[in-house]
């Protein structure tokens, strides 16, 4: 089997991080002011990327897909449950990314949002058809173009240097941290789909984490800077006013395609976990078609509740996986369902939703994960291993 290099993995996650969704989420940080907002972005990404790294390392060391690693801690039934949720999450992300990309692109060249949905969806289909291992020069050219164009966008946003919006109290620091955690957290059920194929699992996971973390922070800062220094939350409009024209179209289309490809591709891999009869590539193509149709038919302007829902599902899940694999060093769940871990996950989910009502400076995810990991350790001490599964 052809393995992927650390550089190839880095390119994949560079493309994932450069996205309109990340820039738009960055605009939400403007009420904190630049310095405080930057701190919230950095703190959130350190928390989120630490989990991102451990999730990827489990896949790299075991050679399992993301949902395959879930089966180690939750059993086959637990794997099916999270795989189904992950497919739904990724259909949602595919729709949101195509919607945001089409909306922004239509601002630059107004030929109709639905047309751009079809164009972007069509390009994602091409990316899927070529395949993750054969993208090669296509990915390198796309990433080089994105890197240059992102620098241009950064210069356009920050060249004024004078804030036009004043900080206010509409967003707490803790809520901002949680928004920063949310993006790397949303990739947790995907990263092992790529690190499992790496030549050097540790190096590939580390390079993927660092690349994604740095570039994601950069995108957040561009969005926050746009809101603070231009007073405009629509990044496409900023590019149009700056006269970027074709460059703006390239940024918007390429960034949307390279990110959404990962969503659709991993949805296909997760779908394979649901049944051996499912072909991952065909499933990814179907997800792209569904996402394109949803992007055309439904409004998707505010994704904050969607991000928090992802956090409440997948933060306790990865907390249990990290505890099982790195602390308890369990070889895998026995039986079809690890009831003990399933109960701990439910408690972790409830804890996250409760913590959402409390303003914590480090956000909800870190205390939720700490609490879930502690519960998992206690449960393993109390419940004998033979009675854990069903």
Whereabouts are the PLM-identified features?
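Transmembrane alpha-helical segments of multi-pass small-molecule transport proteins
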Residues: 12-16, 82-87, 108-130, 144-154, ...
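Membrane-interface loop-to-helix entry segments
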Residues: 115-157, 167-168, 205-212, 307-319, ...
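C-terminal membrane-solvent junction of multi-pass transporters and transport-like membrane proteins
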Residues: 3, 319-390
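Hydrophobic alpha-helical segments and their helix-loop junctions in multi-pass secondary transporters
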Residues: 111, 128, 135, 144-170, ...
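Extracellular loop-to-transmembrane helix junctions
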Residues: 27-56, 78, 367, 371
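Juxtamembrane transmembrane-helix boundary signature
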Residues: 42-74, 81-87, 380-387
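Membrane-interface "cap" regions at the ends of multi-pass membrane proteins
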Residues: 1-36, 48, 134, 151, ...
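Hydrophobic transmembrane alpha-helices that form the core helical bundles
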Residues: 78-111, 257-273
């Amino acid at each position: 089997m052809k393995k992927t290099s650390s550089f190839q993995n880095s390119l994949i996650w560079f493309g994932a991080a450069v996205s309109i969704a990340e820039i738009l989420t960055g605009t939400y940080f403007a009420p904190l002011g630049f310095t405080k907002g930057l701190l919230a972005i950095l703190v959130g990404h350190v928390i989120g990327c630490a989990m991102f790294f451990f999730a990827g390392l489990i896949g790299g060391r075991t050679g399992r897909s993301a949902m395959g690693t879930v089966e180690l801690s939750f059993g086959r039934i637990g794997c099916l449950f999270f795989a189904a949720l992950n497919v739904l999450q990724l259909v949602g992300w595919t729709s949101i990314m195509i919607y945001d990309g089409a909306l922004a692109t239509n601002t630059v060249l107004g030929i109709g949002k639905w047309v751009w949905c079809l164009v972007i969806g069509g390009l994602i289909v091409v990316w899927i058809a070529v395949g993750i291992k054969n993208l090669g020069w296509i990915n390198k050219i796309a990433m080089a173009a994105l890197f240059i164009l992102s620098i241009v966008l950064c210069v356009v946003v920050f060249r004024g240097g004078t804030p036009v919006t004043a900080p206010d109290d509409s967003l707490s620091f803790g809520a901002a941290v949680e928004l920063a955690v949310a993006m790397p957290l949303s990739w947790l059920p995907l990263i092992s789909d790529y690190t499992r194929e790496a030549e050097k699992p540790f190096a590939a996971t580390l390079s993927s984490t660092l690349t994604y973390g740095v570039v994601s922070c950069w995108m957040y800062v561009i969005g926050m800077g746009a809101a603070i220094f231009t007073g405009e939350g629509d990044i496409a409009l900023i590019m149009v006013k700056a006269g970027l024209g074709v460059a703006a179209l390239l940024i918007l289309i390429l960034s949307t395609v390279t990110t959404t490809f990962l969503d659709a591709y991993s949805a296909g891999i997760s779908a394979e976990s649901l049944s051996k009869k499912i072909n991952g590539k065909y499933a990814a193509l179907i997800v792209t078609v569904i996402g394109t149709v949803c992007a055309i038919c439904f409004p998707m302007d505010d994704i904050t509740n969607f991000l928090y829902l992802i956090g409440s599902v997948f933060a306790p899940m990865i907390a249990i996986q990290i505890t099982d694999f790195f602390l308890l060093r369990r070889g895998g769940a026995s039986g079809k369902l690890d009831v003990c871990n399933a109960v701990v996950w439910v408690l972790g989910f409830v804890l996250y939703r409760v913590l959402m009502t409390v303003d914590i400076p480090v956000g909800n995810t870190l205390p939720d994960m700490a609490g879930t990991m502690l519960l998992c350790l206690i449960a393993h001490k109390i419940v004998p291993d033979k009675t854990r599964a069903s």
